[in-house]
A protein has these predicted regions:
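Solvent-exposed, non-transmembrane regions of membrane-associated and secreted proteins
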Residues: 21-213
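Hydrophobic H-region at the start of alpha-helical membrane spans
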Residues: 10-22
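Single conserved hydrophobic/aromatic residue that forms the stacking wall/gate
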Residues: 1-8, 12
Length: 213
């Protein structure tokens, strides 16, 4: 009868809806777990770096010393750069990064970016062949959010290019590059004007002159 047919149809629809909801919950649950585990990896890595802050840095900058003259020139250049920073009142935050351990976590880690006042305190990676790899993959190789902070292979790992583009997700939980939105506030912009990039050989200081979306 039409009534029985309608009732059977309603039961079928409810069953289909239940299956769809279960599938959606599984997908979102898996995505949430991947993101949570990846964030734990970052927190663990940051904790390891912080634990080293009061220890002696086992990776002091090695100045080339092929000749006495070359050594003196390099030392003079470093002293000049330090003097310029002092004149601007810039004090570089100390990060005793253990590059051997960082490479043990992921061979593609080649720098560390730190922006005071934000949550940006992460390793920087560069995949040797796939520019978008770390958009979708985490440091431990799992696929999903939050991915990694990374540059494309067109940019030098020495940060010698005229422009270096650093990529990172705008996460809703305020991790990765989400906290850069703080620079929409002029007071915050004025209070935190510098970006620090650490490599095995040097520390680079960038002054922020503009922020927009």
């Amino acid at each position: 009868t039409p009534i029985k047919s309608s009732a059977a149809s309603d039961v079928y629809k409810r069953q289909v809806l239940a299956v769809v909801l279960i599938v959606v919950l599984i997908i979102f649950g898996r995505s949430w777990m991947v993101q949570k585990n990846a964030q734990k990896e970052y927190e663990k890595l940051s904790a390891q770096v912080n634990d080293l802050q009061n220890q002696v840095n086992d990776n002091q900058i090695n100045i080339p010393s092929d000749t006495q003259t070359e050594t003196e020139n390099v030392a003079q250049e470093v002293q000049t750069e330090d003097s310029e920073l002092e004149q601007k009142g810039i004090e570089i935050p100390q990060k005793n990064l253990n590059w051997k351990k960082l490479k043990g976590v992921n061979q593609d880690i080649y720098a560390w970016i730190y922006i005071p006042g934000t949550g940006v305190d992460y390793p920087v990676l560069q995949h040797p062949s796939d520019d978008s790899y770390y958009l979708n993959y985490n440091m431990n190789g799992t696929r999903g959010y939050p991915g990694c902070i990374y540059t494309e292979k067109a940019n030098s790992k020495e940060f010698t290019d005229f422009d270096t583009v650093v990529y990172g997700h705008n996460m809703r939980n305020d991790t990765m590059f989400a906290s850069l939105h703080n620079y929409e506030d002029q007071t915050f912009f004025n209070n935190f004007p510098y970006i620090y990039v650490y490599t095995k050989e040097k520390v680079l200081v960038y002054e922020i002159f503009a922020a927009y979306k």
